[in-house]
Regions:
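Hydrophobic core segments of alpha-helical transmembrane domains in multi-pass membrane transport
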Residues: 1, 32, 57-61, 111-115, ...
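Transmembrane alpha-helical segments in multi-pass inner-membrane proteins
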Residues: 211, 222-286
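Single transmembrane alpha-helix segments in multi-pass membrane proteins
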Residues: 17-66, 74, 78, 83-100, ...
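Helix-loop-helix "hairpin" substructures at the membrane interface of multi-pass membrane proteins
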Residues: 148-226, 249, 253-254
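Cytosolic-side transmembrane-helix boundaries in multi-pass membrane proteins
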Residues: 184-198, 269-315
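Transmembrane helix-bundle core of multi-pass membrane transporters
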Residues: 110-172, 272-281, 300, 307-315
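Hydrophobic alpha-helical transmembrane segments
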Residues: 19-22, 51, 55, 71-79, ...
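Short loop segments and helix-boundary regions at transmembrane helix junctions
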Residues: 41-42, 84-138, 172, 232-233, ...
Length: 315
């Protein structure tokens, strides 16, 4: 018969700790998945998100380690994201290579290069003093909710801020209308004078910059270090969250929080020595990902031209 330990996961302080940890852990998923939603809305599938995150995480960590400036590290991650976004755009938009294969190639490149740079330039695992929690006045004093939502570091708040910003961009601006038009019917958009390739370049690059920021949030706000394959597949989960959320930023945020709650829950179960096999606990978030992808009614909102290179004159 199951018996919870004295420090039960069902006690309020522990539950608050789990939910607060989930909010923190959602940060890299939000940066990466919201950015990927923007890229995919223009019709480009970027499976290289995880590789971009790895390079962004390393760049942020190394610059912060050598200069002592966290903000220079953040800028370095954004610059790396910019370069990787332009590379992905060149391959998939200009050269019209198959997007899925191109993205996997980009991931392998990011994985290999980040590992090589870490070995050559750092060598051993080192830590930095990362972003510290900031308690938001008044809101941080609210019982329970204040501890869960309003006592985090700047990258956490910034990640959640991307959700309304992305919604406003995609749904309330002329540029967002162009992005969605290019993603659903690039030929029609082209006939109306929209530069399809430019829109896709910008969208993919924005998404890649956000993936770089997701990597920086890992190395400078969550774990405060870098090691090989630090992301452990976060970028691929982020792509799955885009499908789960139906390309809607708010729904994507809900998926990121759901995944993070399950992930935080399994970590706390191990910390509190709940008698569940550790391998089974580690599997829980990924089993959840498979289930939500299988059950979520997301395909009705999929951009029609997703994963399809644009050729002028084709319909």
């Amino acid at each position: 018969m199951f018996q919870a330990p004295e420090t039960s996961i069902f006690r309020l302080p522990v539950a608050i700790g789990i939910l607060s940890a989930a909010v923190r852990m959602a940060t890299p998923y939000l940066f990466a998945s919201v950015g990927e939603a923007i890229a995919q809305s223009s019709g480009v599938l970027n499976l290289g998100v995880d590789g971009v995150m790895l390079l962004g995480a390393f760049a942020a960590f190394y610059v912060a380690l050598t200069t002592g400036s966290l903000w220079l590290g953040v800028l370095a991650s954004m610059f790396v994201g910019l370069l990787m976004g332009l590379l992905m755009s060149l391959i998939s938009v200009t050269l019209k290579a198959e997007q899925g294969i191109s993205g996997i190639g980009l991931y392998m490149f990011g994985l290999g290069l980040s590992s090589l740079l870490f070995k050559v330039m750092v060598g051993t695992v080192k830590t930095v003093v990362g972003f510290q929690p900031i308690k938001i006045p008044l809101l941080g004093n609210i019982p329970i909710l204040g501890e869960i939502f309003f006592q985090h570091s700047i990258p956490v708040y910034a990640a959640f801020l991307t959700v309304p910003l992305a919604w406003f961009l995609l749904d309330k601006t002329t540029w967002g209308l162009k992005i969605r038009a290019v993603g659903h019917n690039p030929a029609a958009a082209d006939s109306l004078g929209v530069n399809v390739n430019l829109v896709r370049y910008v969208s993919v690059t924005i998404g890649s910059i956000m993936a770089g920021l997701g990597g920086a949030s890992l190395s400078l706000a969550l774990v405060n270090l870098f090691q090989e394959n630090l992301t452990a597949g976060i970028g691929f989960i982020a792509v799955a969250l885009v499908y789960f959320g139906g390309w809607r930023p708010a729904a994507i945020m809900g998926g990121a929080l759901l995944f993070s709650v399950v992930n935080a829950f399994q970590l706390w179960m191990q910390v509190l020595n709940v008698r569940i096999p550790s391998d089974l606990a580690v599997m829980l978030p990924y089993v959840l990902t498979i289930l939500v992808l299988a059950l979520a009614p997301q395909l009705s909102r999929q951009p029609v031209a997703l994963n399809k290179p644009f050729e002028r004159g084709e319909h």
